[in-house]
Regions:
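N-terminal secretory signal peptides that target proteins for export/translocation
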Residues: 1-14
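Periplasmic alpha-helical coiled-coil/stalk elements that build and connect Gram-negative outer-membrane
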Residues: 11, 35, 133-248, 258, ...
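Amphipathic alpha-helical coiled-coil segments
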Residues: 51-65, 133, 137-158, 167-169, ...
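Small/polar (Gly/Ser/Thr/Ala-rich) solvent-exposed segments
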Residues: 52, 74-95, 105-132, 152, ...
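Membrane-embedded beta-strands of outer-membrane beta-barrel proteins
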Residues: 100, 302-304
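Short, charged, amphipathic alpha-helical segments
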Residues: 116-120, 183-191, 388-396
Length: 425
């Protein structure tokens, strides 16, 4: 009875411990379900500082466009005029006044409206840059995730091969003890096993590097296990108009908006050829009486002031020329961006096609041939008709072909992801 009671208690204790361990794992940062590419993209887009920064810039220009179209605040004038300093008697002199007035400045030409339009173009530029930042972020996350997937999958392939090599080491040691093989076979088997361990260590280091790169966008989730399935990307569009896709790209839209904003700077500079003016109205209160005994009349004054842009050679002309050069610079920058995007598209499209051909070659021929060669070498070695060195070369060739097949598939997907940055998926 006592023994049964103890067994029941032990089972309950084990169950409780398992529950505690599972519960603890659920709350460990980085522990969780396998991370898919889609999840990584969504996590990265949640709070990317570049995107948020451009969005804030766009809102700031939008707010500025409202203030840019508003007239300057009017000025209120208060004062005492022509006060006698011997007595400070406001009724002593006929010209003494207490004045109150208001003045309003009016900027040159249509400068307010043009400045508003310029701020609106700058807002559109920042909005487009936010969209471009989103595309770049998704592309960067895809590149890092694909590279991470390669390292994880490559490590699994090497682990499978290591188990085979470990068995071969055991077999050669047994055969050596029985006198059926020489010592060189044992040494070579151990050497190849150590080389596999070295390759695994290098791959593990790269895996950790890509996880750290991914962590800058998604945090501790980057250290989760990743999905075993090969990452799927949106399909590339068929029959795409490349020039239209590039012209409508957010980066080009941002550059184009900058060009339009620079053109508005030219229009603003041209407004300096027009006079700026101001209007003022003031009222003067007078105290005391006239010599005939009547009360002194108050004074009212209305003025219009404006400047005359006579000397334009070294000021207005230079400002217009400066604005024109800035516009040219913005246009050249947009042209360069167009060329860069076209270069990226052409390069990645050719890369994707070449890798697609190589994937077909590996799937249709190389993988099966390498596997058949490996099996044949193993059977031949077991039958005593081939040397151990030939067997090891066949096994290593199969490993290299499997790793290269994985590399080609990942490289094709990487080119695919970079093409999607251009086409917008």
């Amino acid at each position: 009875m006592c023994q049964t009671h103890i067994d029941v208690d032990n089972n309950a204790l084990k169950t409780s411990c398992c529950l505690i361990v599972v519960s603890a794992l659920l709350f460990i940062p980085g522990a969780g379900f396998a991370l898919s590419l889609d999840q990584a993209e969504k996590l990265a887009l949640k709070a990317d500082p570049r995107v948020l920064g451009y969005q804030s810039t766009a809102r700031s220009y939008e707010e500025a466009s409202v203030s840019d179209s508003t007239l300057p605040d009017p000025r209120l004038m208060l004062g005492a005029v022509n006060v006698p300093v011997d007595s400070f008697d406001l009724s002593q002199e006929a010209m003494t006044q207490l004045k109150v007035g208001i003045q309003q400045d009016f900027p040159r030409g249509s400068s307010l409206e043009i400045k508003q339009q310029q701020s609106q173009w700058l807002s559109r530029s920042a909005t487009a840059l936010a969209q471009d930042a989103r595309r770049k972020l998704v592309s960067d996350v895809r590149q890092a995730y694909l590279n991470l997937y390669y390292e994880v999958a490559a490590l699994e392939i090497i682990s499978e091969t290591r188990r085979l090599f470990s068995n071969l080491v055991s077999i050669t040691e047994s055969n050596y003890a029985a006198g059926r093989v020489n010592q060189q076979d044992v040494v070579q088997a151990s050497l190849e096993l150590s080389r596999l361990d070295d390759r695994a260590a290098k791959i593990k280091g790269k895996e950790e590097g890509y996880r750290a790169e991914l962590a800058q966008w998604i945090g501790d989730q980057a250290w989760n296990p990743i999905d075993d399935m090969f990452p799927l990307l949106p399909e590339l569009p068929e029959d795409i108009d490349v020039n239209a896709a590039i012209t409508s790209h957010p980066l080009i839209q941002a550059k184009n908006a900058r060009v339009n904003a620079a053109r508005k700077s030219i229009d603003i500079a041209k407004q300096d050829y027009k006079p700026g003016w101001s209007a003022s109205l003031d009222y003067g209160f007078r105290s005391g009486d006239n010599p005939d005994g009547s009360s002194r009349s108050d004074f009212a004054t209305a003025l219009v002031n404006f400047d005359i842009p006579l000397f334009t050679t070294d000021r207005q002309d230079r400002r217009v020329a400066s604005s024109q050069e800035k516009t040219n610079a913005a246009r050249y920058e947009m042209d360069d961006a167009l060329r860069q995007l076209k270069r990226i598209y052409d390069k990645e499209l050719h890369s994707w096609r070449r890798h697609n051909e190589r994937v077909s070659l590996y799937q249709d021929s190389l993988l099966a041939s390498a596997k058949d060669n490996s099996r044949a070498s193993l059977q031949a070695y077991q039958s005593g008709v081939t040397e151990f060195n030939t067997l090891m070369r066949a096994q290593i060739t199969e490993l290299d072909v499997r790793l290269e097949n994985l590399r080609v598939k990942v490289d094709r997907a990487s080119a695919h992801a970079r093409l999607l940055y251009i086409t917008g998926e």
